From Swiss-Prot:
Each ARM repeat, start to end: 355-394, 396-435, 437-476, 478-517
Domain of life (superkingdom): Eukaryota
Domain U-box: 227-301
The protein's name in its UniProt record: U-box domain-containing protein 12
Pfam families: Arm, PUB10_N, U-box
């Protein structure tokens, strides 16, 4: 039953609308539970009434409700919906708490993956992300402004992903169904929602009519074409620009024209005759948008690029056409440091913008070229290159290409010697690549853990957290736990634990909890006088930190009576009793187990004194 529900969730279409991020996050976490669901005992896997089955069913129902529901309603009542997502995440977290998955016959890596996902559900059970404040402000303005600003309505429709009349029809049906299902007006705002929907419809109709009229208007004004503003003309061809780019002098030209000028060997700006400091071409997106708006307003269709089918596909799916990408690759290959720095910086920004850019940039052959630039002597080029690889790695298919290009040793070297921002982004890149299990082994073997620990100690607040996240993910693999312990991470984590002003207690406890499950890690932690800080966290920490501290203390006490007696002497019993009654299910179990160990140790001590 749980497996079937998880499969149904995986089959749901990509989420749309203002709640697409929490929907995507919830779906992703459920998919990561697949290995656990494959190993459930027969009684649990076939039952339809277990806590896990109920929780996954609630997740499926919420995702379906969000998919089919009113996008306007979801935006206007964002807080309530986000609370629902937090509640479902909490329900799954508690169901996993009650499931003794550590007793299942699963590979160690699967056990650790499930534990990691379990912790993700726990974190998601408490709301941290606020609703989209800009969208909330836009909605409030649109509901009071009559008539509404078309640009405002366009921005709202983009955020809600209500672009076409078909989208509007579905939204109208969703609002109608919402009224029927609630037998009235939910929160008394149906009139407002309907009013806003009408404004959005009018906006879409106006745009559709404008688009439909383009062909007719173009035909009727051929004999009286409007005068093209000078700033929209290329200074070389004097024709309307379709792909404006900026050169180092600050002037804007049509890409194909200025590229021909540069390819002919010219090193000056055609208009000002200034020497060009470099030949990089930066897209002028603002001017391109203004030209597009002017063309639409005047019924003019932009001239089409003369491209083959592959080029057209690339142009539609990314911010660059094929020629532009080829130019970027050539600049990466050039021996000119200024060219390489500018090109790497351009790719860094493009790869950050959208998934299509990441795909097209990788297909153009950028990854090996960027990997080569990791060895650049120019710090800024190095920073651009590693950050571009980080942004490209967001697309799953690019991860393998980056690793296959032998990037990991070079990223590790950058992590050791780069500037602070470069080191931070190198750590984030290693974390992104380590999502793939086999890469955890490769990254650890390349010597990444010692420089990550250095960043953990001397980095900026962001750098420390990037390093901690990367180390945690790498330590899901047992061999990397040993590497981290041998590299001396424990003493630094203990220092974080006793420094409440450092802001790293959460990360320290998470890392200690995973390291304490390793025999060598447990020994080193036990030698680091862990009892006083752990007891303090159990007494005064947040619910999550108390749970982790109890888990670490249980691992230490279960194999060492001296640690048990030391914890008892430190006065932790009352806090453990309170935790065993009011904590999370996992915290209750750990606290109760420690209390039993203390009771047993006390009895053994009395018997020893009696002899």
């Amino acid at each position: 039953m749980p497996k079937r529900v998880a499969d149904e969730i995986a089959a749901l279409p990509e989420p749309r609308g203002p709640l697409r991020r929490p929907c995507a996050d919830l779906s992703r976490r459920v998919r990561l539970l697949a290995p656990l669901l494959d190993h459930l005992p027969a009684s649990s896997s076939s039952s339809s009434s277990t806590p896990l089955a109920d929780a996954l069913g609630a997740a499926r129902d919420l995702l379906r409700k969000t998919r089919d529901g009113s996008k306007i309603d979801q935006a206007m009542r964002g807080d309530a919906f986000l609370d629902e997502f937090a509640g479902v995440n909490r329900q799954i977290h508690l169901a996993l708490d009650a499931l003794p998955y550590n007793t299942f016959h699963m590979p160690q890596e699967v056990q650790e993956q499930v534990a990691l996902v379990h912790s993700q559900f726990q974190r998601a059970s408490t709301r941290t992300d606020p609703p989209d404040t800009q969208l909330s402000m836009d909605l409030a303005w649109a509901l009071t402004d009559n008539p509404s600003d078309p640009a405002l309505l366009t921005r709202i429709s983009h955020k809600l992903q209500l672009h076409t009349m078909a989208d509007m029809k579905n939204e109208s049906i969703a609002l109608h169904n919402m009224v029927i299902s609630t037998a009235g007006e939910p929160d008394g705002c149906v009139d407002q929602m309907s009013s806003l929907l009408k404004k959005l419809k009018d906006c879409v109709v106006t745009e559709d009519h404008a688009n439909d009229a383009l062909t007719t208007r173009s035909a009727s004004i051929k004999h009286r074409s409007p005068i093209i503003p000078d700033e929209f003309r290329c200074p070389i061809s004097l024709e309307l620009m379709q792909d404006p780019v900026i050169v180092s002098s600050g002037q804007t030209y049509e890409r194909s024209c200025i590229q021909k000028w540069l390819d002919s060997g010219h090193k000056t700006c055609p208009k000002t005759q200034q020497p060009l400091s470099h030949t990089s071409l930066t897209p002028n997106f603002v001017l391109k948008s203004l030209i597009s708006q002017w063309c639409e307003a005047n019924g003019i269709e932009l001239p089409k690029n003369k491209q083959n089918s592959r080029d057209k596909k690339a142009a539609k799916s990314s911010d660059y056409d094929h020629a532009g990408l080829v130019s970027l690759m050539n600049r990466l290959r050039s021996g000119n440091q200024d060219e390489q720095r500018a090109a790497a910086g351009e790719i860094r920004l493009l790869a950050k913008r959208n998934v299509n850019n990441r795909i097209c940039i990788a297909e153009a052959g950028a990854i090996p070229l960027l990997v080569n630039l990791l060895s650049s002597s120019d710090p800024r080029t190095q920073e651009h290159a590693v950050t571009a690889l980080l942004n490209l790695s967001i697309h799953e298919n690019n991860k393998a290409s980056i690793v296959d290009s032998h990037a990991i040793p070079k990223i590790v070297e950058v992590l050791k010697t780069g500037s602070m921002e470069t080191r931070e982004n190198a750590a984030a890149t290693l974390f992104s690549l380590s999502v793939v299990d086999e890469n955890k082994v490769t990254i650890g073997a390349a010597g990444a853990i010692p420089p990550l620990i250095n960043l953990l100690c001397d980095g900026s607040p962001r750098g420390k957290k990037d390093a901690a996240t990367a180390i945690f993910n790498l330590c899901i693999y047992q061999g990397n736990k040993v590497r981290a312990v041998k590299a001396g991470i424990v003493i630094h984590l203990m220092n974080f634990l006793v420094d409440p002003t450092g802001g790293m207690i959460d990360e320290a406890l998470s890392l200690l909890s995973i390291l304490a499950g390793n025999p060598e890690g447990k020994i080193v932690i036990a030698r680091s006088e862990p009892i006083p800080p752990l007891v303090e966290v159990i007494k005064t920490g947040s619910p999550r930190n108390r749970e982790n501290a109890a888990a670490i203390l249980w691992l230490l006490c279960s194999a060492d009576t001296e640690q048990t007696l030391a914890a008892k002497a430190a006065g932790v019993e009352d806090a453990l009793k309170e935790l065993s009654e009011t904590g999370t299910d996992r915290a209750k179990r750990k606290a109760s187990s420690i209390l039993e160990l203390m009771h047993q140790a006390n009895e053994d001590s009395l018997k020893g004194n009696g002899h």
